[in-house]
Amino acid sequence: MGPIHNYFGVVCLGIAASVYFRPECALYGSRIATFAVLLTGIAISKLLYQLFIYPQFVTPLKHFPAPPNRHWLTGNTGSLLVDTPHALMKEWAKTIPNDGILRYYIVGNMERLTVTSPAVLREILVSKAYEFAKPLVIQQTLRRVLGNGILIAEGEEHKFQRKNLKPAFAYRHVKDLYSVFWSKGTEMTKLIRKDLQSRKAPDDNTIQVRTWASRSSLDIIGLAGMGRDFGSLQDPENSLSQSYEMIFATPGLGTKILFILGMLLGNTTWLAKLPTKQNRLIDTGCRNIRDATRRMIREQKAKMEDPNAAAEVDIISVAMRSGNFDDDNLIDQLMTFLGAGHETTAGALQWAIYALCKHPDVQSRLREEVRANLPPIHGENPGPIDAATIDSLPYLNAVCNEVIRFHPSVPNTVRVALNDTTLMGHPIPKGTQVVISPELVNHMPALWGPDAERFNPDRWMGPGKANTGGAASNYAFLSFLHGPRSCIGQVFAKAELACLLAAVVGSFAFELKSPDAPLEVREGATIAPKDGVLAKFTPVEGW
């Protein structure tokens, strides 16, 4: 926390030692009372230092511009929560002159930097990718749910995991999975139709998109990740699906406040040990998922040992054949694929449906392209699909890219400097936390033009724009990050979204149940509509 705070701690430690060895020095003759007073003094000193002294007099980052009007408790955000202030960050980036780095304070006057230029992004994500890591509190929080897979691993361990998993996510492998994505998309649309047909009132056609998106993406991860159909679409009460419902439930206000306390203390492991209802649900869900993945690994190994069995193309089989992962690490990778993979794609599909409800002209145009180029899926013999067919639809890919740009499922990530370093020549002390925000960068007019904050798939149409959106830099599109810590599954995720969205938009016309209601979001490791997307689905016949 700084020399003043450290000095006070040393003094308190010295007093405590004196009292321990010389009881006659204790307050009121009680060691317990003395230690209680000392601990209270340390806590108060840390709080005063954090709230008042450090940001005003001590911070070594004063040379970076910051917003005015910092509050002693809520910093520059005006919020008692740790949610990233995306709207404020966008305004700061526009109005505060900076050369790529801004400084601000969140609740408790905890200091953060955020990045606004491609040059700084390139430095932190590529050239110095392993000089910055996820903060310990974030690692602890995510590891509990996702295991110590590629998303959490750091340093040499991450390099090892990425090198050995990369072949499983290469396009030459993912293209063979398009048929899996498409089959689940068609299964989902048929089940939605069946659901609508079973309802008594003809105007009862509201669909909760979240549940269908989550179950379809979970089934896809099962098939593509480990060659196993979880059957979540067919069975809403599927144990694996229910486990994730437990884990990803929106945390209550009390949990958020305790998390802030954990951040101030620099450690959140104790939060998981509190006897709260949410912890019990998360522990049960995680235990169920870990037990299930352990069984899957065991069964998959037995299948691979059979000399007569056909070679599997799922991701975990590719990882097994490399021979570089033991069972525990394979379980961690499966936990990561299942949790992070299905949650982000489910969120992306929800955002896609929401965007198409808000832009019916885009929805109609996309439906025309899909129905004109893809085989019907509601006849007796639905036609097959392959990667080349899906990839050849320019407007489908433009819409998917714009959804991912405009509504990044992971709106921000945080990195902490592991050692004293520099960014663009500016000194960055060890422990400095840097917020990298796709939500900010993906909407910057300086990179995307004056319509940066408008949903516009046409920006991805035309010569040379299919992969860039016409942006001024490839670092303008930050949804999958860049460099060695970029999302290893981005090709997989984009293909999955394209197949699911094509199946839905080709089969239904949809509009929001309450089009004028304000959008509320649920923000955690990912961001999605708070209560899901409630949309009225109307089957469109003839396809």
Swiss-Prot record:
- A single cellular component GO annotation: membrane
The Enzyme Commission number assigned here is 1.-.-.-
Question: Which UniProt keywords are listed?
Answer: Heme, Iron, Membrane, Metal-binding, Monooxygenase, Oxidoreductase, Transmembrane, Transmembrane helix
Cite the InterPro entries for this sequence.
Cyt_P450 (IPR001128), Cyt_P450_E_grp-I (IPR002401), Cyt_P450_sf (IPR036396), Cytochrome_P450_monoxygenase (IPR050121)
- Gene3D superfamilies, per the entry: Cytochrome P450 (1.10.630.10)
Question: Which reaction(s) does the protein catalyse, per the Swiss-Prot or TrEMBL entry?
Answer: presphingofungin + 2 reduced [NADPH--hemoprotein reductase] + O2 = sphingofungin B1 + 2 oxidized [NADPH--hemoprotein reductase] + H2O + 2 H(+)
Origin: domain of life: Eukaryota
Binding residue positions for heme:
C487
Biotechnology annotation for this entry: The sphingofungins A, B, C, and D, show a limited antifungal spectrum of activity but are especially effective against Cryptococcus species, fungal pathogens causing opportunistic infections in human.
Q: What class of enzyme is it?
A: oxidoreductase
Transmembrane portions of the chain? 1-21, 32-52
Q: Does the keyword Metal-binding apply?
A: yes
Pathway as given in its UniProt record: Secondary metabolite biosynthesis
- Name any cofactors this protein relies on: heme
Q: Report the membrane topology from the UniProt record.
A: Multi-pass membrane protein
Q: Which GO terms describe its molecular function?
A: heme binding; iron ion binding; monooxygenase activity; oxidoreductase activity, acting on paired donors, with incorporation or reduction of molecular oxygen
Explain the induction of this protein: Expression is positively regulated by the sphingofungins biosynthesis cluster-specific transcription factor sphG.
Localization in the cell = Membrane
Which terms does the UniProt entry file under GO BP? small molecule biosynthetic process
| Similarity section | Belongs to the cytochrome P450 family.
Q: What does this protein do?
A: Cytochrome P450 monooxygenase; part of the gene cluster that mediates the biosynthesis of sphingofungins, bioactive molecules acting as sphingolipid inhibitors via inhibiting serine palmitoyl transferase (SPT). Sphingofungin biosynthesis starts with the PKS sphB that produces an C18 polyketide precursor 3-hydroxyoctadeca-4,10-dienoyl-ACP containing one delta-6 desaturation and one delta-12 desaturation.
Descriptive protein name: Cytochrome P450 monooxygenase sphH
Source organism = Aspergillus fumigatus (strain CBS 144.89 / FGSC A1163 / CEA10) (Neosartorya fumigata)
Organism phylogeny: Eukaryota, Fungi, Dikarya, Ascomycota, Pezizomycotina
